[in-house]
Swiss-Prot record:
The keyword Transcription applies. Its main location: nucleus. Keywords: DNA-binding, Fertilization, Nucleus, Transcription, Transcription regulation. Residues 60-117 bind DNA. The keyword Transcription applies. This is Mating-type protein MAT-1.
């Protein structure tokens, strides 16, 4: 028989760490003494958290901030840009970026913010707040004065879209540059930001950064001259693209209108059930459109038939005396079984028996035609 033994402290700790919340509540209820409950509660407070058997998924490395994205985030707040949505301003921001003389500073600022974000998270390191602190420190133009400082003019085209322009001989292209003639490192930017209360939770390591900026005034002037030429070429290219786009739109509209006209003509032809005239080089310029005239000369057969059916036949009793060998229709000497059409030489009132008015010229087309019941006796 196995002897009972007390569990070790490690076994008790492992048992407690693997219990659920409901099981822990049940254990607390089983402890009756207040002192024991207090000791057990204190033990739970310092106990290590339960380890899950599932391996932790390594966090994917985040992509560093792009210099142009930072530039756009800061200068999209230019007050004159407020009436238009972002999709209308993308081309303008691109033109400003191409001519901006401070690209190196924007590339430098992207590195410290990416480092801070990777350590403490994006929520604890707002990008717009970072630029509001660092850009004035590096003497970059603020959004409200950027266009004026660099000599840009904002206008609206015929379609209501914003456009910007700057003359090629503008004197403003060489101004508005930041502190590009002094050595600035990533650590310097982070330290300055933390001195103003930004990203207090970030811990700067002691390893020096290899990213810094140090340029002379001459290199800055060379860059500004290059920016002038780039701006001039970019403005001309943008204007040329604008003209080409309008020409394409006008051409598409012309084709669309021609299609509408052809469709309308076809609908008219279909409505009148007419076929378009054939087009052939061998077709004569003029052809006869006179319809053939039908032969309307009197026909003796049909004229006689109409007269026979429409003329009145003698109907009176006294009329029989005027005809040779004529009998009355009700003569007693006639056989009652003989059909009247086989009897020769009698007179009768044919119009009173059958209406032959349908055979008259110009008669009513709705008149009832006669029914020849004795046609089978012929």
């Amino acid at each position: 028989m196995a002897l009972a033994r007390d569990p070790t402290g490690a076994e008790i700790a492992r048992f407690i760490a693997t219990r659920t919340g409901a099981q822990m509540v049940q254990l607390m209820r089983c402890i009756k003494e207040p002192a024991a409950q207090a000791a057990f509660t204190a033990k739970l407070l310092v106990a290590p958290p339960a380890m899950s058997g599932r391996p932790a998924t390594p966090e994917k490395a985040r992509k560093a901030l792009n210099a142009f994205v930072g530039f756009r985030c800061y200068y999209i707040t230019i007050p004159m840009f407020k009436p238009w949505p972002m999709k209308k301003l993308s081309n303008l921001i691109g033109l400003l970026w191409e001519a901006d003389p401070n690209k190196s500073l924007w590339s430098l600022m992207a590195k410290p913010w990416s480092t801070i974000r990777d350590q403490i998270g994006k929520d604890q390191a707002p990008l717009d707040q970072f630029f509001r602190i660092i850009c004035p420190h590096l003497k970059l133009p603020d959004p409200a004065s950027y266009l004026e400082i660099h000599g840009w003019t904002l206008a609206v085209n015929e379609e209501g879209d914003p456009i910007i322009s700057r003359s090629a001989d503008s004197e403003f292209a060489s101004v508005g540059t930041g502190n590009t003639d002094m050595a600035i490192s990533v650590e310097d930017i982070i330290t300055y930001g933390q001195s103003l209360g930004y990203a207090h939770g970030f811990i700067l390591d002691n390893k020096p950064s290899s990213t810094f900026l140090g340029q002379s005034v001459s290199s800055t002037l060379e860059k500004n001259i290059s920016a002038i030429s780039i701006t001039e070429g970019t403005s001309k290219a943008a204007h040329a693209r604008f003209l080409i786009r309008n020409k394409r739109r006008a051409k598409r509209q012309t084709l669309r209108n021609a299609g509408y006209r052809a469709s309308l003509d076809q609908d008219i032809l279909n409505g009148h059930q007419l076929d378009p005239a054939p087009v052939d080089e061998n077709m004569p310029d003029c052809y006869s459109t006179t319809a053939p005239v039908l032969d309307q000369s009197p026909n003796k057969f049909y004229g006689g038939l109409t007269t026979l059916l429409s003329d009145q036949i003698s109907t009176g009793q006294g009329d029989a005396d005027h005809l040779d060998n004529a009998y009355l229709f009700n003569d007693c000497s006639l056989s009652g079984n003989a059909p009247f059409m086989t009897i020769a030489g009698f007179t009768t009132n044919m119009p009173n028996l059958t209406d032959y008015g349908a055979f008259r010229l110009g008669a009513d087309e709705d008149v009832t035609l006669p029914i020849f019941d004795d046609i089978t006796h012929i």
